[in-house]
A protein has these predicted regions:
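N-terminal helicase ATP-binding lobe
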Residues: 1-293
Length: 293
């Protein structure tokens, strides 16, 4: 039985006006946005056509997302010899959408390399990254890897790093650079975050990458420091803890947590990396709005 045509009120994905079921079935938009009767295989092709016609509105973000993904894809190809593969594609898209999330994946899937390459993408857009690693050895390895990747990409980001092995003079230089936001990428340990939280909270950054978050979660002080670095106050943390206690009886608890979260992460993307999170931090997960990726 053939379904008769229908008109859906305020349902055009591009302008919000009325659109026919026939056009929607073809992956298209209303006749005000596109007078031609065309069929589209994907939303990117549709957005590109609307851009050509000068009628692109609500779908503009689709075109921008595709352009930025192409930039990241080029970075991966030039640095590694291949584009983002498998779950890396999903991780890239989520970062480009401005999502904060936790990567839970076994070793060998390129979680750390993904974080380093995304930091280079952000620096190419004049945006700062903070990378947190469990030990000074891994910080040193990551700095070396980042420098190699930068050379392959012919980029020259201002990379600074801090760990216990630096001289007093080197430590002072790093702290001065942090105070003045005179860097593109900063790599350090979770211990540094605890000891220098006030300094880091004044840093204007866009991307926070926490490698091996399991180690950070072993210390409540470390987990709390990372939440505060992300933009949450001690009051936010305590209020969330109390709301989680009430969640079984109060159906509005999670909505209240979501409202608390709104605006706190604005302009920032926070990504946690883990091989297997066996014991999570419910306050951190709730405040960050994490869902595994």
């Amino acid at each position: 039985m053939e379904v008769p045509p229908a008109v859906f009120i305020n349902s055009c994905p591009n302008c919000g006006l009325d659109v026919s079921s026939e056009r929607l079935a073809k992956g298209s938009v209303c006749d005000k946005c596109l007078d031609e009767e065309l069929e589209f295989n994907g939303v990117y092709d549709l957005a590109k056509k609307l851009h050509e016609r000068g009628t692109l509105k609500n779908l503009k973000n689709v075109l921008e997302l595709h352009r930025e993904f192409s930039k990241v894809e080029r970075i991966f190809k030039e640095a590694l010899g291949y584009p983002p593969l498998g779950p890396q594609r999903s991780w890239v898209l989520r970062v480009l959408r401005g999502e904060s999330f936790a990567i839970i994946a076994p070793p060998g899937l390129g979680k750390t390399t993904f974080g380093l390459l995304m930091s280079l993408y952000f620096s190419s857009n004049k945006k700062r990254t903070i990378g947190i690693f469990p030990t000074r050895t891994i910080v040193a390895q990551s700095v070396s890897r980042l420098q190699d990747l930068s050379t392959k990409l012919e980029l020259a980001p201002r990379i600074i790093y801090y760990h216990a092995g630096l001289t007093q003079g080197e430590k002072k230089e790093v702290l001065s650079a942090l105070e003045s936001n005179d860097f593109d990428i900063f790599l350090t340990t979770s211990r540094f975050v605890i000891d220098n939280l006030d300094t880091l909270k004044r840093v204007d950054y866009n991307f926070l990458f926490v490698d091996d978050v399991d180690t950070a979660l072993k210390s409540s002080k470390s987990a709390k420091s990372i939440l505060q670095l992300s933009g949450f106050s001690e009051d936010d943390i305590e209020k969330t803890r109390e709301l989680l206690r009430q969640a079984r009886k109060d159906e509005t608890a999670f909505r209240k947590i979501a409202e608390l979260r709104q605006g706190k992460l604005e302009g920032k993307v926070v990504v946690f990396s883990s091989a297997t999170i066996t014991k999570g931090n419910p306050v951190m997960s709730a405040l960050m709005g994490f869902r595994p990726g």
